[in-house]
Amino acid sequence: MTNPRVFFEVAIGGKTIGKIYFELFADKVPKTAENFRALCTGEKGNTQAGIPLHFKGSSFHRVIKDFMVQGGDFTAGNGTGGESIYGEKFPDEAFPYPHDQPFLLSMANAGPNTNGSQFFITTTETPHLDNKHVVFGKLLSGKGIVRQIERTETGEQDRPKQPVTIVDCGELPADFQVPVGNVDDGTGDDYEDFLKDNDNVDVNDPASVLGAIEKLKSIGTKLFKEGNAEGALKKYLKATTYLEDYLPDDLSEENIAKVHALRISCYLNVALMALKVNQPKVAIKAATSALDDETVANKEKAKALFRRGSGYAALKNETDALKDLNAALELEPADGAIKNKIEEVKQAAQRRREAEKKKYAGFFGGK
């Protein structure tokens, strides 16, 4: 038999980020797979309380990095509800697969034989869940989407601070071609959004990892030279994500130096591109990351201070802007761009003071 395939279209904070595609193991756990499939299509109508038996519009209510993302509670939305197509709960069907890899679909439960509609997607190996939770499917495509969910900021009870919503879902036609891996977007970037999810990068080989990061950086530079600052920013950010995920403890001194150099360079490039596309907060964060690297040289430090100061200036925070810009000028006293920026910020601060003076003078001017 051919196993059914389904999809989720996901939004974070109201912005659609893409689709996740799944294969359901109907050949091994047909009852569990059918429950999930029907909840994707919504074909079974409503619960007794009149709530649609449908994942559409429901959320991922629990997210734990390096563990799993959980959803499927379309009745309460907080992990206390949900219902299967067979009634409120149904028994554990079988345990044919271990939780031995990321991107498996497994049933959430409150103990033995309490399956409803809640599910989770693993983001790493979770062997402690074996023979307790029914694995009934796997992800076919959309690793980057799951990783974005996994990395969304959470608050109490591991609940995402921004809603992570299944805005659409359904079953795929038999002839639908699911995109495999990360499809080249036309720039030469055929890498997944997160380092450890790549089949074409050996995370145990520094040359393979650093080669991928260098390629992403060069793609970003090419896009920048072509006038595509927004596209360049995406590639530089992707390179920094790879660098943040790459923390082996057995690197040679030569490779450690390469990692530091790449990290500083990529953060500086992110800061520059972010300023060009009017994302000053991104620029400030990236420049700060460059400054935090203990190997940053004075020339790069001056660039980072200049770009962070420019970010503060864009946010009309002239105090912090001048602090950074003056520090940059101390390192590069002959740099005309820094001098010009300092003068520009001083003038902006003066105009602000004069405007405020004029505004408040009216409160005490008589009539």
Swiss-Prot record:
Superkingdom of origin: Eukaryota
A GO cellular-component term linked to this record: cytoplasm
Keywords: Cytoplasm, Isomerase, Repeat, Rotamase, TPR repeat
Reaction it catalyzes: [protein]-peptidylproline (omega=180) = [protein]-peptidylproline (omega=0)
UniProt keyword Repeat, yes or no: yes
Chief location category: cytoplasm
Residue stretches of each TPR repeat: 213-246, 264-297, 302-335
CDD domains (UniProt xref): cyclophilin_ABH_like (cd01926)
EC numbers, comma separated: 5.2.1.8
Gene Ontology terms describing biological process: protein folding; protein refolding
GO terms, molecular function: cyclosporin A binding; peptidyl-prolyl cis-trans isomerase activity; ribosome binding; unfolded protein binding
Signal peptide per UniProt: none
Role according to the record: PPIases accelerate the folding of proteins. It catalyzes the cis-trans isomerization of proline imidic peptide bonds in oligopeptides.
Name by which UniProt lists this protein: Peptidyl-prolyl cis-trans isomerase D
